[in-house]
Swiss-Prot record:
A single MF term (Gene Ontology): ATP binding
Zinc finger unnamed: from-to: 3-34
Official protein name in the record: Transcriptional repressor NrdR
UniProt lineage: Bacteria, Pseudomonadati, Pseudomonadota, Alphaproteobacteria, Acetobacterales
UniProt signal peptide: none
UniProt key word Hydrolase: no
The species this protein was found in: Acidiphilium cryptum (strain JF-5)
Residue span of region Disordered: 1-21
Amino acid sequence: MRCPFCGEADTQVKDSRPTEDGAAIRRRRFCPQCSQRFTTIERVQLRELVVVKADQRRVAFDRDKLARSIRTALRKRPVDDERIERIVNGIVRKLEASGEAEIPSSEIGELVMDTLKEVDAVAYVRFASVYRDFREAKDFKAFLGTMDPSK
């Protein structure tokens, strides 16, 4: 693994542990060249997923982009980082388990919305406002009218 500080190609693994959910390996590394320490996380990738955008462009699936979107929706909400990681892992597993190499972006968006609906109503509305491109207050009002009032 290349050192992110100095670019040295030969680094040493000092510690390896599975993550809490067991879906990845967390490795603590040391660079003998610059004496810096850093952490890497390794995950099993079952297949290369391709996202089909609305305009039919195809781009490689970006797990980090999915995580950023979910973190943005959950910003300042009472959901910890470990839970967010489990949410992201769950969505990625569903996408990989679908058996499809190409996934429409709309399917990913709906999976995120379904998940956020169960986790946090405010995050659900935040994500929906971007995903469904709300332009005016009436868009929010119409969307909120479709929600279960007990949530």
